[in-house]
């Protein structure tokens, strides 16, 4: 079988490498061109780096759907397009450039979490299980029939970066099975997606990372884990001189307790002596911030322009003054509101 691989990020590399090792013919590797940053040349994507290491031809069209690119794809006379983390929706003309169309490895258990950030939204939604799906592609967004899938339990302390690395490995066997199904003309066994269960997984923004301490700790925990390593989460420490310090939060643990808010304002520090009075404790290397229904124990933080440090080291250097408090924005956090809606309102449309 003659295959065109299409992808960009590290999520695609294990499956692409398995296809390459399977002795199938790879006609070309297609990736999106990178934009230059800070006056430097464009960085090459993990897929391009992988392809060049293996001596495979690489093509980086601006749009996969323009007429010239579709004509070029057709000239390759490929049997199948294998797509993963490519970032553009293929129109019918592009899909028809290969004899069997295309399959897509997607980082969720479809139809849940259709979109650009499925792994992150699996964590944000508080899903018990995550997984991968291989679909026979249609022009809709992650809407094609499912050829095969695999699932895994999300660990309670797992962040999106760690989960994505696991899912990229989990996706290898389903991807090979999907190709084999099409080789055997077994794709009638595919399962149409029930769009009444579909949810969206839109691309995340840096502003999604601002912590709003007046939300429940379970939501803050999902936000912190779901946005690691990108775009990351942050808060602002209000300083006695009226200024504020931006603080990145790398790792934190939630503790639910309705008694906690009695000891201070939301966003304030919860002191170990107060915690002991209600039988709560945490590592002496961390600090605890009061939220709506408990505390977030900050274990690793990074003040703006500084290195990462433990919560206790941060407190000694920046939060030693009495009455210090982290900013509590007045407006709702749009990301957290979307997380709440995700649990109750299926997408219902393609």
PLM region spans:
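Surface-exposed, charge/polar-rich loops and edge strands
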Residues: 1, 162, 348-350
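N-terminal Rossmann-like dinucleotide-binding module
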Residues: 1-42
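Internal alpha/beta domain cores that form substrate/cofactor-binding pockets in large enzymes
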Residues: 2-4, 27-28, 57-76, 81, ...
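A residue-level signal for conserved active-site and pocket-lining positions in enzyme catalytic cores
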Residues: 7, 29, 51, 81, ...
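Structural motif corresponding to alpha-helix initiation and N-cap regions
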Residues: 13, 41-44, 66-70, 116
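Donor/substrate-binding cores of folate-linked one-carbon enzymes
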Residues: 21-22, 80-200, 207
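Conserved nucleotide-sugar phosphate-binding/catalytic loop shared by glycosyltransferases and other
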Residues: 31-36, 43-62
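Internal anion-binding site segments
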Residues: 195-350
């Amino acid at each position: 079988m003659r295959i065109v691989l299409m992808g960009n990020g590290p999520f695609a590399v294990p499956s692409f490498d398995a296809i390459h090792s399977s002795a199938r013919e790879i006609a070309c590797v297609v990736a999106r061109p990178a934009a230059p940053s800070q006056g430097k040349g464009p960085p090459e994507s993990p897929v391009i780096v992988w392809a060049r290491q293996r001596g495979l031809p690489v093509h980086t069209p601006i749009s996969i759907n323009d007429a010239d690119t579709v004509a070029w794809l057709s000239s390759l006379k490929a049997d199948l397009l294998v797509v993963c983390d490519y970032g553009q929706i293929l129109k019918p003309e592009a899909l028809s450039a290969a004899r069997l169309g295309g399959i897509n490895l997607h980082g969720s258990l479809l139809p849940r979490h259709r979109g650009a950030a499925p792994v992150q939204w699996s964590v944000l939604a508080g899903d018990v299980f995550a997984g991968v799906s291989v679909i026979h592609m249609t022009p809709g967004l992650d809407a094609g029939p499912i050829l095969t899938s695999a699932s895994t339990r999300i660990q309670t302390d797992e962040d999106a970066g760690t989960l994505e690395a696991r899912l990229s490995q989990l996706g290898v066997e389903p991807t090979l099975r999907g190709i084999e199904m099409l080789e055997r003309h077994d794709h009638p066994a595919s399962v149409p997606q029930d769009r009444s269960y579909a949810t969206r997984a839109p691309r995340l923004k840096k502003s999604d990372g601002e912590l709003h301490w007046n939300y429940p700790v379970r939501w803050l925990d999902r936000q912190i884990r779901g946005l690691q390593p990108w775009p990351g989460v942050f808060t602002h420490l209000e300083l006695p001189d009226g200024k504020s310090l931006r603080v990145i939060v790398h790792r934190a643990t939630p503790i639910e307790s309705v008694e906690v808010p009695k000891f201070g304002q939301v966003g304030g520090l919860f002191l170990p002596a107060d915690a002991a009075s209600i039988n709560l404790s945490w590592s002496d290397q961390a600090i605890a911030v009061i939220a709506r229904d408990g505390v977030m124990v900050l274990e690793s933080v990074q003040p703006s322009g500084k290195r990462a440090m433990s919560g206790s080291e941060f407190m000694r250097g920046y939060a030693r003054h009495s009455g210090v408090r982290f900013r509590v924005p007045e407006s709702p956090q749009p990301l957290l509101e979307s997380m709440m809606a995700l649990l109750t309102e299926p997408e219902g449309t393609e």
